């Protein structure tokens, strides 16, 4: 009896698990727990017979003085625990690195060709066939090594053990895997593999476990690390990552089905349902228009607001997709109107948005993948609006706040710095504007929250919470205005109320001509004070939201409001356009808000 193997866990395997758990604990979702538990179960079930055979046939062994002595099918308890702890750690690294990803667009495969050269673009089906041949070759090689026996035995057992899993997974999920960002796969494979190589080297040198001579090829990657051991840790991490990616593939299929529906809301899939989707439903059942448009919406969100993109990761499934689709419409409409070369073109786009909304809500009873409804919608509106309007979850949203949003854009159109026209004259004007361009979006967000996660509160209470949400949106808009004084002045707009400017001896025209005037600093602070008051006033309302979205809403708003604190800390950088909130600061803010 000994404690060597147990101490390997205590020193090297459990500490990373604890650290990863502490880092990720506030963000854990029920579905992620399901995924990890399921994968750990599969790891134990698949590995136990194989490992037991290796021990019984003396491919490897454990000295009596390195293990406590209790076994399961001749496998030391410490080894059985390793199946679980490795799967847990690798799965959690994968989840950490991929939390930000919106899975749905990856069902369509890679956006850009993976290989272009002398033979042209390699088709996705060619990659599928190549993968099948490759993993079949691994299986054949493994069987050949086993038949040869001797020094090739351990290598053959590893290859023949992994190949059935890879052959099963690849044809069903190759498109999804090839669509994912490469780093989302190789980082969760490489990091734990390198770490375990180091741990294994130390254990082999100490004799904690032994690969018997005559069953290995006697090639070492470095002193103390046998080729077979290095391969074992690499392929086990590959299987874990592909396993959890396979579950993400099934989740994406489930989310697609819910997203295009007009009735499904707030569901969390069970593991049996995900397995059914994985084995029976493929990307062929997904509408290419929906996948393409969601990919465009995600790209737009990442380009325009990293804070909102990362904030959206706090939400789950269909609700997150609905929020991305909502943001896509708001952002696209804003860009078309703001980037218009003249006032007439801007007015044209406002009218087109109104027309598109009217038609979209008339068709709200049709599923998103309804071809006839899609054709009816797209033939009646400009191509620039097709994706943004089509994706809108109209069956789950009221139309009123979206119409009010367009009124905010109409206020923007009233600015005319050459003629000295600035519509934000009073603090009331500022509040009205902030409601139209941001309070409406917060209202729509809460409408989606209550639709996906109904709670038993009275209509009056629900309206009170939504009204407080309008204040939450205004708080974010006041922060935006404080941040963008210089940028807004460059396009002839001043959102600081004229009466505030007059108190400092300024006019809007003076701000346009000199947006870095030091006299604006106290006014910017005043905007931030107003934002923080609105934010504080919403805290009680946030606490009344459904439990599973309360923390995500608080985290998203808190992280965005931290921009105001960064502005206060870096006032000169704001003038020079160098303001940037670090990812670590955003993560820290979200972690504290979610805890």
UniProtKB/Swiss-Prot annotation:
| Location of the region described as Phytoene synthase in the Swiss-Prot/TrEMBL record | 256-595
Q: Give the span(s) annotated as Lycopene beta-cyclase.
A: 1-249
Pfam name, any one? SQS_PSY
Question: Topology versus the membrane, per the UniProt entry?
Answer: Multi-pass membrane protein
Q: Which residues cross the membrane?
A: 3-23, 35-55, 77-97, 130-150, 153-173, 176-196, 231-251
UniProt keywords (A-Z) are:
Carotenoid biosynthesis, Isomerase, Membrane, Multifunctional enzyme, Transferase, Transmembrane, Transmembrane helix
Catalytic reaction equation(s) = all-trans-lycopene = gamma-carotene; gamma-carotene = all-trans-beta-carotene; 2 (2E,6E,10E)-geranylgeranyl diphosphate = 15-cis-phytoene + 2 diphosphate
Q: Which GO terms describe its biological process?
A: carotenoid biosynthetic process
Key word Membrane present: yes
Which PROSITE patterns does the protein's record reference? SQUALEN_PHYTOEN_SYN_2
Q: Which pathway does this chain act in? A: Carotenoid biosynthesis; beta-carotene biosynthesis; Carotenoid biosynthesis; phytoene biosynthesis; all-trans-phytoene from geranylgeranyl diphosphate: step 1/1
State what this protein does: Bifunctional enzyme that catalyzes the reactions from geranylgeranyl diphosphate to phytoene (phytoene synthase) and lycopene to beta-carotene via the intermediate gamma-carotene (lycopene cyclase).
Full protein name: Bifunctional lycopene cyclase/phytoene synthase
Species the sequence originates in: Trichophyton verrucosum (strain HKI 0517)
Lineage of the native species? Eukaryota, Fungi, Dikarya, Ascomycota, Pezizomycotina
């Amino acid at each position: 009896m000994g404690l060597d193997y147990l101490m390997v866990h205590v020193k090297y395997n459990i500490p990373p698990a604890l650290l990863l758990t502490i880092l990720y604990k506030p963000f854990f979702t029920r579905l992620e727990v399901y995924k990890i538990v399921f994968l750990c179960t599969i790891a134990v079930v698949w590995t136990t017979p194989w490992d037991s055979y290796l021990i019984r046939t003396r491919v490897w062994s454990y000295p009596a003085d390195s293990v406590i002595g209790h076994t399961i099918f001749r496998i030391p308890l410490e080894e059985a625990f390793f199946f679980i702890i490795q799967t847990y750690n690798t799965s959690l690294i994968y989840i950490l690195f991929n939390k930000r990803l919106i899975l749905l667009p990856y069902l369509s495969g890679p956006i850009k060709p993976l290989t272009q050269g002398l033979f042209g673009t390699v088709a996705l089906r060619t990659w599928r066939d190549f993968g099948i041949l490759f993993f079949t070759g691994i299986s054949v090689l493994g069987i050949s090594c086993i038949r040869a026996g001797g020094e090739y035995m351990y290598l053959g057992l590893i290859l023949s053990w992994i190949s059935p899993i890879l052959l099963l997974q690849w044809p069903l999920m190759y498109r999804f895997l090839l669509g994912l960002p490469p780093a989302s796969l190789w980082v969760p494979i490489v990091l734990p593999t390198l770490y375990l190589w180091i741990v294994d080297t130390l254990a082999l040198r100490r004799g904690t476990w032994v690969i018997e001579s005559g069953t290995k090829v006697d090639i070492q990657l470095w002193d103390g690390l046998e080729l077979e051991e290095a391969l074992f840790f690499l392929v086990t991490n590959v299987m874990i990552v592909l396993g959890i990616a396979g579950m993400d593939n099934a989740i994406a299929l489930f989310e697609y089905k819910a997203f295009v529906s007009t009735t499904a809301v707030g569901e969390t899939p069970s593991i049996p349902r995900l397995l059914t989707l994985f084995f029976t439903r493929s990307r062929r059942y997904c509408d290419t228009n929906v996948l393409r448009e969601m990919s465009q919406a995600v790209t737009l969100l990442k380009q325009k607001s990293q804070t909102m993109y990362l904030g959206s990761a706090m939400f789950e499934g269909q609700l997150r997709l609905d929020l991305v689709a909502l943001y896509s419409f708001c952002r696209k409409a804003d860009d078309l109107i703001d980037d218009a070369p003249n006032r007439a073109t801007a007015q044209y786009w406002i009218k087109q948005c109104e027309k598109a909304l009217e038609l979209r809500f008339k068709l709200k009873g049709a599923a998103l993948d309804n071809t006839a409804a899609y054709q009816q919608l797209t033939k009646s509106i400009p191509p620039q609006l097709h994706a943004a309007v089509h994706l809108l979850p109209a069956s789950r949203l009221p139309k009123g706040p979206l119409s009010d949003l367009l009124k905010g854009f109409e206020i923007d159109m009233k600015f005319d710095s050459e003629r000295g026209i600035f519509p934000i004259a009073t603090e009331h004007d500022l509040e009205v504007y902030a409601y139209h361009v941001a309070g409406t979006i917060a209202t729509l967000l809460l409408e989606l929250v209550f639709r996906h996660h109904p709670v038993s509160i009275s209509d009056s209470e629900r309206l009170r919470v939504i009204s407080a949400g309008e204040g939450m949106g205004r708080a974010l808009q006041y922060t935006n205005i404080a941040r963008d004084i210089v940028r807004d002045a460059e396009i002839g707009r001043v959102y600081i109320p004229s009466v505030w400017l007059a108190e400092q001896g300024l006019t809007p025209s003076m701000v346009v001509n000199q947006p870095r005037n030091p006299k604006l600093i106290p006014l910017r602070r005043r905007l931030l004070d107003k934002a923080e008051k609105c934010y504080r006033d919403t805290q009680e309302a946030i606490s009344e939201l459904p439990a599973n979205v309360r923390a995500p809403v608080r985290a998203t708003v808190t992280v965005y409001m931290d921009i105001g604190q960064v502005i206060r800390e870096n006032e000169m950088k704001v003038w020079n356009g160098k303001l940037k909130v670090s990812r670590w600061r955003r993560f820290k803010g979200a972690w504290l808000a979610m805890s």
